[in-house]
């Protein structure tokens, strides 16, 4: 640990001088895991290696975030004043989370393929089996428990990765160093990375976690896609988020309906969320639809003006005639 006063507490010295290198420790551990996997170890050994390495990485990162959250007021560490680069916000650290996530996700698929789909069942069902003391049953229950731990780890990795990328973005905003890196990172995070971290959780029966992450981070496009998912979405969830977030969620939801040609569904919200729908039409270029809303609400002058305005945009006579019908 280098030179230090032998009378000084070793743990205190570590946190004082070496905690900044935790990111390097995680990077080293990641490299070791990659080497072991590439050596061709069997599925049980691979499971043990990945589960244990994930435990260490998550223990370090989640503890760091929880500590900072609990002490942020005391140390004045709010998101608007991040001008320092924490070890979690370093580019070398955040780049580890994507392969960590994919490695863990792949392990779930590999185990299901090699060990059989029964490992994805609830182990409690087998614990009530008369053959509970059977060696094969005990092994299956053990593997089912491992599978559930891996699923939970995947959820935690998604959470910590999103937090770390948010940290990096806030640091770049506060430092005013690299505008190009900030723009590129925000685009990658919002359009590619964050969806790829949250959506797969639905496939492993962790849809509640997916909803919670999207809600917590106000990822309204992802929330919309989850709410309109035939398997996990519901009208109750949609109404909940419309009431909670108003225009922020509503605009993204209504935009999704327009993009996907679900206009009948869109106009179903007129009665309960008419004002929200009107705000959406007023702030978006959807005159071809907004006049229908105006007619439904009795705003005939607005409907007439909108139709005239829309027809003036047409360059051919036939579309004008159709638009004015």
Where are these regions (language model features)?
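Extended alpha-helical assembly domains of large eukaryotic scaffold proteins
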Residues: 51, 59-325
């Amino acid at each position: 640990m280098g030179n230090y006063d032998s009378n000084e507490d070793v743990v205190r010295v570590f946190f004082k001088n070496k905690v900044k290198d935790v990111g390097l420790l995680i990077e080293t551990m990641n490299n070791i895991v990659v080497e072991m996997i590439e050596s061709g170890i069997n599925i049980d050994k691979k499971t043990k290696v990945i589960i244990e390495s994930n435990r260490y990485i998550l223990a370090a990162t989640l503890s760091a975030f929880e500590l900072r959250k609990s002490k942020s007021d005391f140390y004045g560490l709010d998101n608007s004043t991040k001008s320092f680069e924490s070890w979690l916000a370093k580019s070398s650290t955040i780049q580890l989370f994507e392969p960590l996530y994919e490695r863990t996700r792949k392990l779930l698929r590999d185990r299901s393929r090699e060990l059989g789909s029964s490992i994805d069942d609830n182990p409690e069902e087998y614990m009530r089996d008369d053959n509970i003391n059977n060696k094969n049953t005990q092994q299956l229950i053990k593997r089912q428990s491992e599978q559930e731990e891996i699923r939970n780890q995947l959820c935690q990795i998604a959470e910590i990765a999103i937090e770390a990328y948010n940290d990096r973005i806030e640091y770049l905003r506060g430092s005013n160093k690299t505008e190009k890196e900030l723009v590129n990172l925000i685009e990658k995070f919002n359009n590619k990375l964050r969806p790829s971290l949250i959506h797969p959780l639905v496939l492993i029966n962790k849809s509640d976690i997916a909803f919670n992450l999207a809600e917590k981070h106000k990822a309204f496009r992802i929330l919309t896609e989850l709410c309109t998912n035939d398997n996990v979405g519901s009208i109750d969830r949609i109404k909940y988020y419309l009431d909670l977030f108003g225009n922020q969620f509503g605009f993204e939801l209504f935009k999704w309906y327009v993009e996907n040609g679900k206009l009948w569904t869109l106009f179903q919200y007129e009665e309960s969320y008419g004002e929200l729908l009107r705000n959406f039409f007023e702030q978006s270029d959807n005159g071809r639809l907004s006049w229908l809303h105006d007619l439904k609400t009795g705003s005939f002058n607005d409907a007439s003006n909108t139709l005239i305005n829309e027809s003036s945009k047409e360059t051919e006579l036939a579309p004008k005639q159709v638009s004015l019908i």
